[in-house]
A protein has these predicted regions:
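Acidic/His-rich structured neighborhood in mature extracellular/periplasmic domains
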Residues: 88-233, 243
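Sec/Tat signal peptide C-region and signal peptidase I cleavage site
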Residues: 23-27
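Short acidic, glycine/serine/threonine-rich helix-capping segments at coil-helix boundaries
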Residues: 357-364, 372-416
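An acidic, Gly/Ser/Thr/Pro-rich helix-cap/linker signature
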Residues: 28-120
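Bacterial N-terminal signal peptides that target proteins for export
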Residues: 2-15
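Sec-exported extracytoplasmic/periplasmic mature domains
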Residues: 43-59, 64-71, 114, 118-121, ...
Length: 418
C-alpha cells in the first residue's frame, strides 16, 4: 500500500472509529465553497491525465448537476476529540453480538469461503474477521455518495492529487458498470462496499467471484469476500500460517525490544521464557514473530501490568496493511479467532491494565437507556456514543464526582444502575 493511501486510510480509520464507537461527534459548520470554482475544477479534471481512462460521455454523465459537499472538508481536517484506549476499541469491535453474527456468517458462506481459500490461501475466518470489522457484515456500508465526496475532495482542501486518483477510479467503476450509481456510497474518504475498498484498491484487488461479469463488492457477498482475500494475498498473506497468538510473559521480562517488526525465531522466544497464554509451549506454526503489547505504557486508573501480549507474524502485517492500525489489525485477528472457535469467550486471557474496562454495544445501549431515563436529550439508545451522549455522560460524571471526560466505561454504567 502506498504511503499517501496509508496516510488517508489512517486518518479515515481514526474518524471512522470515532463515528463507530462514539457516533456523530462533529458539530463544526462546514466551510463555504465556491460552486463556480467547483465547476471549473471539474472541467479541468476532465481533460487531465489522471482521468484518461474515463471517456468524455461517462465523465459528463456521472458529474452532470453535481454539487460539492463541504462537510467532507470538515472531516478531512478533523482530529478525534480524544484517542480511544485500546480496551474501548476492542470492546465495541469484538463484542458478543459481532462474534455471534460472525459465526452465523461463517457458517452461511463456508462453501464460498473454502473455494476462496483454495484460490488465495487466505483462511476463511480471517476474511470474515475483516468483513465484520469493516462493515459489520454488510450492515454499515456508509451513506455518502462517493462521486460527490471525491469530487469535492479533488477540488478543495488537502491532498487533492491523491483524491483525484480516487475520483477517477470511482468514475471508471461506474463507466465499466461494476456498481450501479445509486449503490456507490460509502465513507467520507471514499471507502465503499462490504469490506470498504478505496476505488483504486478496487482495480488492484476486486474479483468477479460469482461469474456475472461485474466486480460487485457492494451487493455480491462472494465478490466482496474474494476481493478481500485477494487484497490480503497481494499484501503477502501466507497460506497455512496463523496471524499469531496471545502469549504469557515470564516475570521481569524486558519488553524494550517489543514491536511488531522486531521479529525473532519462535525458538528464541521459547528460550526467553514465553509460553502461550494457557502456559503451554509455543507452537512451530510461525517461523518468526514480533512481540506486540498494545497497552504497554497505557495502564489507567491505577491498574498495573502490561495487559495482553501477542506474538504476531507476517499475516498480522497483512491485516495491518488493510488500515494502518495495530489496534484495528488486532480486532480483526481476535474476531477471526472467535468466529472459528465456537464457545470461546471474547476476553483475552490477560486482562487489560485498567480498572474501568470498555463497554460492548449492548452495554452502550443500556447506558443510553439510563441516560434517557434521567431526562437527557440524546436521541435513541442506539449504542453509538455521539456528541449528545458524551455531554450527558459529562453531566452525570460531574454529579457522581467522577472525572468529566465524557468516556463511557464500566464504572459509569455501574454507578447509573445503582
Amino acid at each position: 500500500m502506498n504511503k499517501p493511501f496509508a496516510a488517508i486510510r489512517r486518518s479515515a480509520l481514526a474518524l471512522a472509529s470515532t463515528t463507530l464507537l462514539l457516533g456523530s461527534a462533529f458539530a463544526q459548520e462546514p466551510p463555504a465553497v465556491d460552486e463556480a470554482a467547483f465547476r471549473s475544477c471539474l472541467a479541468q479534471l476532465q481533460g487531465s491525465s489522471a482521468f484518461r481512462a474515463v471517456d468524455a460521455a461517462s465523465f459528463t454523465r456521472f458529474t452532470q448537476g453535481l454539487a460539492p459537499d463541504p462537510s467532507v472538508l470538515v472531516l478531512l481536517d478533523r482530529q478525534p476529540e480524544f484517542t480511544l484506549p485500546v480496551w474501548d476499541y476492542i470492546a465495541v469491535l469484538v463484542d458478543d453480538e459481532r462474534v455471534a453474527d460472525g459465526r452465523a456468517a461463517y457458517a452461511k458462506w463456508q462453501d464460498t469461503l473454502r473455494r476462496i481459500e483454495q484460490q488465495t490461501g487466505v483462511a476463511p475466518n480471517v476474511v470474515v474477521g475483516v468483513w465484520g470489522v469493516e462493515s459489520n457484515f454488510g450492515q454499515n456500508l456508509g451513506g455518502r455518495p462517493l462521486v460527490q465526496s471525491l469530487a469535492t475532495l479533488s477540488c478543495f482542501g488537502r491532498r487533492q492529487a491523491y483524491f483525484r486518483g480516487e475520483f477517477a477510479a470511482a468514475l471508471r467503476i461506474l463507466q465499466e458498470g461494476h456498481i450501479a450509481p445509486d449503490k456507490l456510497v460509502g465513507s467520507w474518504a471514499g471507502a465503499f462496499g462490504q469490506t470498504q475498498f478505496m476505488p483504486s484498491t478496487f482495480f488492484r484487488s476486486a474479483v468477479d467471484f460469482d461469474g456475472d461479469g461485474r466486480r460487485d463488492i457492494v451487493d455480491s457477498v462472494p465478490d466482496a469476500l474474494a476481493s478481500t482475500a485477494k487484497f490480503l494475498q497481494n499484501a503477502g498473506y501466507r497460506r497455512g500460517e496463523p496471524w499469531g497468538f496471545e502469549v504469557q510473559l515470564p516475570p521481569g521480562f524486558d519488553t524494550s525490544d517489543a514491536g511488531r517488526k522486531n521479529r525473532r525465531p519462535i525458538d528464541a522466544w521459547r528460550r526467553a521464557g514465553l509460553t502461550l497464554a494457557d502456559g503451554s509451549a509455543l507452537p512451530d506454526t510461525l517461523p518468526s514473530a514480533g512481540l506486540l503489547i498494545p497497552a504497554r505504557g497505557r495502564s489507567a486508573g491505577g491498574a498495573g501490568g502490561l495487559g495482553p501480549a501477542f506474538l504476531v507474524g507476517r499475516n498480522f502485517d497483512t491485516l495491518y496493511s488493510y488500515n494502518a492500525s495495530e489496534n484495528y489489525a488486532l480486532a480483526i485477528a481476535q474476531l477471526s479467532n472467535l468466529v472459528a472457535n465456537p464457545g470461546a469467550g471474547v476476553a483475552f486471557a490477560t486482562p487489560w491494565p485498567t480498572d474501568d474496562p470498555g463497554l460492548s454495544r449492548a452495554q452502550n445501549r443500556e447506558l443510553q437507556s439510563l441516560l434517557l431515563a434521567r431526562g437527557h436529550d440524546i436521541g435513541s439508545a442506539d449504542g453509538m456514543i455521539g456528541a449528545k451522549t458524551r455531554e450527558a455522560i459529562k453531566t452525570e460524571q460531574q454529579r457522581l464526582g467522577m472525572k468529566p471526560d465524557g468516556r463511557a466505561g464500566q464504572k459509569l454504567l455501574a454507578a447509573l444502575k445503582r
